[in-house]
Structures are given as C-alpha cells and as structure tokens.
C-alpha cells in the first residue's frame, strides 16, 4: 500500500516492531491454527494454510512454532476454538478509507474494540460495504531492490503470470491477480529471486494524499488497530510523500 508500506519499513528500521514480536507471533499462530482446522494440515493442499505459513516465515517465526500451530489445528482437542473471520470498514482522519480484517472468538468484543479505536483516534467505524468498493484483492510480492536487476525480475515475474512490476522506494513491488499469486511466488523462488514478503492484500484503487498532521493522526489509528489482539490485517488508501514521511518519522 502506498505510504503504509513505507511506514512499516521505517518502523522495522527503528526496531519498533521488536517489542511487538511476541504479540505478532501469537496472531500468526492463531491464523495458522484456524487455517489448518478449516482446511487440513497440508499446505500443499490448503492454500489458506500455505499463505498463513508463508506470512509467519516472512516474520521469522521459528519452524517449531509454525508446526505446533498446525498441530493445534489438526489434532484431537484442537485449541483453535470457534474463531470467525470478520471485516470491518471505516474512515480515518482526512477521509482515508480503512479495512480491518479480524479473526476473533468474540464478535461483540471485537466490534466494541474496533469502534472504540476508530473513535479515539478521530476516525469512524462504517457499515459493511462503505469502503470495500475502493479496494481490490491482489497478490503482492515485495523484493528488495538490491536483490535482483529489473530485467531479470520482470522476465521471471511476468513469465510466471504477474500483472505488474514497479519500483516502490527500496523494493520492487510485484502485483498479481489472486488466482496467479501462488504461481508467481513459486516462479520467483524457482528463479532464485529472494523476496521479503508475499501475501494477498486489499489494494486501494485510488489514494488520498495526507499532510504531516493528518498523517500522524492516521498512522496512530493504524498502529492502534494493528496492536489489537483480534486484528490480522489493516488496509488503508492513504498516500504519504517521502518528505512528509520523513517529517512524521523524525
């Protein structure tokens, strides 16, 4: 996502995510366990599990943790619980559209928490469908710009079925249709191209440019949502220039 991905990169460089690693692993484990419960423990035959496992690996979760999460989903007396997937939609300051993907065992608690976070940070929780039309589901693979040349990446990605390849800051951004995502990821791996992350994402079709003040408010809202235990993913359609991002992160 324009702006958001850059902010995430800045946070990683500053080490801000280190303190949240335990909470992140707990969320990733929950997603793996539920995916294994719903579709079986073989990633080759369960695309949802394959994506959850890949996301965990991208976050450097130990393989033992990943396997234990799969076992919880497939074993007798599963700890997966009665979790359900819910998507909330709303607005951040500046008219920024926000989508929040939740995996929760308590729908009422999740709704209350998400509504409170939006309200506290100057946003507003909307109704189903209020902003979803502003996004489209895409596969997104981020490749470090110094890991591969443009021509080599373009050839491998497009041959595997990618839709587009563009430079976004210090990363190449490979975009695919959801149906081609797994094939493109596999194609890059077979070509020996190292990528930093690969996931299905809700990509904004248009973006809202933010000044420094509104960017700070919006990013505080995004961070608060991401820190909630039930929240798996947050998507927003803001765009923050390099100059404003540097001011916000300074």
Swiss-Prot record:
Family annotation (Pfam families): TACO1_YebC_N, Transcrip_reg
Coiled-coil ranges (or none): none
Gene Ontology terms: biological process: regulation of DNA-templated transcription
Top-level taxon in the UniProt lineage: Bacteria
Cell compartment(s), UniProt: Cytoplasm
Alphabetical UniProt keywords: Cytoplasm, DNA-binding, Transcription, Transcription regulation
HAMAP family: Transcrip_reg_TACO1 (MF_00693)
Listed NCBIfam families: PRK00110.1, PRK12378.1, YebC/PmpR family DNA-binding transcriptional regulator
Annotated protein name in UniProt: Probable transcriptional regulatory protein Rxyl_1318
């Amino acid at each position: 996502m324009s702006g958001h991905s850059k902010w995430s990169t800045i946070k990683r460089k500053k080490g801000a995510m280190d303190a949240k690693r335990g909470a992140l692993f707990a969320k990733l484990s929950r997603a793996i366990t539920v995916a294994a419960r719903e579709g079986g423990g073989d990633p080759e035959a369960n695309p949802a599990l394959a994506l959850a496992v890949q996301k965990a690996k991208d976050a450097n979760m130990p393989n033992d943790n990943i396997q234990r999460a799969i076992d919880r989903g497939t074993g007798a007396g599963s700890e997966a619980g009665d979790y359900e997937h819910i998507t909330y939609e709303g607005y951040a300051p500046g008219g920024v559209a926000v989508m929040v993907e939740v995996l929760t065992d308590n729908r009422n608690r999740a709704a209350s928490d998400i509504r409170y976070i939006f309200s506290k940070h100057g946003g507003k929780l909307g109704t189903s469908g209020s902003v979803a039309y502003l996004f489209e589901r895409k596969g997104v693979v981020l490749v470090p710009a110094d890991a591969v040349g443009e021509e080599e990446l373009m050839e491998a990605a497009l041959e595997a079925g990618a839709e587009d390849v563009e430079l976004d800051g210090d990363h190449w951004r490979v975009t695919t249709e959801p149906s081609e995502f797994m094939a493109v990821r596999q194609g890059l791996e077979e070509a020996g191209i190292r990528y930093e992350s690969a996931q299905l994402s809700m990509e904004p079709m248009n973006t809202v440019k933010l000044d420094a003040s509104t960017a700070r408010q919006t990013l505080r809202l995004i961070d608060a949502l991401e820190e909630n235990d039930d929240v798996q993913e947050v998507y927003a359609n803001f765009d923050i220039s390099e100059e404003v991002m540097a001011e916000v992160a300074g």
